[in-house]
């Protein structure tokens, strides 16, 4: 029996979570999220090791074992909170892979390659998920929908993770790329922001939009950029894989 067909680009949406969270909902959200985060972090470690830094390798972090990368809050609590709050998308993070950038061959360019490894891996996973849509119609009906929902969420989660991480704010990957490519006169002031990077993100993603809403202003600019960029990349991947 033929199962569900792969979606056209116009119908592609992450699986919405209903009021009552079920094991099915968890299985189609948590599995692709853990895979996306695990491969993202492992990729940093693999590239760092290839470029001369053995820190992650010695600590056992160059691994595709999710248990090596799980952060209790970022990988478990935060996604669960988003699920329970019926967020339109699921997001999370893992423990950052430790990298000694001074040990890399060609330190600044090496930092760029290590940083790009995570988002590039997520885009590759998203491309594989989109390509796999074509296989769903050949699966038994009782498993096709589950596989399709996992693939749809894998596509969205991986692209979102890649796009968000490329924001040029340290310690995000985009911030590392900027530090490696900018002239030192610009890179040094940006590097000084790293200890406050997460606070800056919370400010521009949550506090600034909330403050703007009090005055009738839409200041949620970064979320709009991430959302629009994510949609564009998803559409591009669907075209590339013949799903448009």
Indicate where each model-derived feature is located.
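Hydrophobic transmembrane alpha-helices and their immediate loop junctions
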Residues: 2-244
């Amino acid at each position: 029996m033929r199962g569900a067909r792969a979606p056209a680009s116009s119908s592609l949406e992450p699986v919405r979570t209903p009021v009552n969270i079920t094991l099915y909902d968890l299985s189609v959200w948590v599995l692709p999220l853990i895979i996306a985060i695990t491969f993202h972090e492992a990729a940093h470690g693999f590239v760092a090791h290839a470029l001369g830094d053995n820190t992650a390798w010695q600590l056992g972090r160059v691994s595709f074992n999710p248990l090596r990368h799980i952060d209790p809050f970022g990988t478990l609590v935060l996604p669960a909170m988003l699920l329970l709050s019926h967020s339109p998308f699921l997001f999370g993070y893992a423990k950052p892979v430790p990298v000694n950038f001074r040990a890399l061959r060609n330190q600044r360019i090496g930092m760029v390659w290590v940083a790009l490894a995570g988002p590039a891996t997520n885009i590759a996973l998203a491309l594989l998920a989109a390509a796999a849509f074509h296989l769903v119609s050949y699966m038994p009906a009782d498993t096709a929908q589950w596989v399709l929902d996992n693939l749809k969420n894998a596509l969205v989660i991986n692209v979102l993770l890649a796009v968000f991480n490329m924001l040029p704010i340290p310690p995000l990957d985009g911030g590392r790329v900027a530090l490696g490519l900018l002239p030192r006169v610009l890179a040094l002031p940006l590097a000084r922001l790293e200890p406050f990077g997460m606070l800056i993100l919370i400010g521009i993603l949550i506090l600034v939009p909330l403050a703007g809403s009090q005055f009738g202003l839409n200041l949620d600019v970064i979320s709009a950029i991430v959302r629009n960029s994510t949609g564009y990349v998803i559409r591009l991947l669907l075209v590339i894989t013949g799903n448009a």
